[in-house]
Amino acid sequence: MKEVVVLTFALLSMGSVQAAQDPEAVFNRSCGMCHNGQLPTAPKKGDAAAWQPRLAQGTDTLVKHVTEGFNAMPARGLCMDCTAEDYKAVIDWMSK
């Protein structure tokens, strides 16, 4: 029985995924420099008209743009410790 418990715990810990960071905290730390209006081409938080054509490209494309850099967007969006899940959460938060 002890082996089953140990094996179960080991399997569960291998499959754990790092929880996404707080989107607002990531925005304030990394994204807000450009997305608060200082950079005219960067869509501002909550600007539905600016976000709509970007969201139409799909989340995977937007995450790729953040990760690799796109136009004036620096690679990794200045968040060096963000995961793809973090980027998805921040994109979702910013676009609302």
Region locations from a protein language model:
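Gly/Gly-Pro-rich "capping" loops immediately C-terminal to redox-active cysteine motifs
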Residues: N36-K64
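The canonical Cys-X-X-Cys-His
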Residues: S30-G37, V90
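Axial heme c-ligation environment in periplasmic c-type cytochrome domains
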Residues: A42-K44, H65-M94
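Bacterial N-terminal signal peptides
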Residues: V4-S13
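Sec/Tat signal peptide C-region and signal peptidase I cleavage site
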Residues: G15-A20
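Short sequence/structural segments immediately N-terminal
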Residues: E24-N28
